[in-house]
Amino acid sequence: LRFDKAQMTNLQESLYKEMLITNRSGAYCSTTLVGCNIRKYDGLLVIPVPELDDENHVLLSSLDETVIQHGAEFNLGLHKYQGENYSPKGHKYIVSFEWEQVPTWTYRVGGVLLRKELSFDTSIHRIYVRYTLLDAHSETQLRLRPFLAFRSVRQWTHENGVANRSYNEVENGIRMCLYQGYPDLYMQTSKPTDWHYCPDWYRGMDYPKERERGYN
């Protein structure tokens, strides 16, 4: 399976090409090939939480990457907001998408060529995101911004004062739990990394497949 740059950057075509990865623990990852969630069931890490109910729950909605070179930032993420607004339009940097063994994206930002691979642990609630810098003409940094949800796939989350915004440091990362009854979400890297804690709410996200089903 392969799609080229022309196919990936045309949202009329690529936005509704969806992917699903599952494992034996009951966890799954569901999104579009351009990484823009279009259903409330979508998420990078969705798991059952039997301590709460019989539903699946979105812990990690998405993970935005930003390539930084010479002080300039290039965000590779893509989200749809109300009113047909898309931001930050990172799909325009996709050179190709391939799926042989695992889903693989290749991005080009100026002189930077970056590969991203996605895979699941087969037996536990764990997803791996692997980045490989294939080419760079100068010093390059990669910043990751996780979007947390901690909600049932059947519900919406809105800004509130109940969410626990604190975190605990773990090896090469942090762990967080937004609401009582949920398991901790561990976010770790394979090497020591600088973590900058700056929590914020993102408002007005739009899921077009839900509107088609009659949900606001």
Regions found by a protein language model. Give the residues of each.
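Terminal accessory carbohydrate-recognition/targeting modules of carbohydrate-active enzymes
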Residues: L1-N216
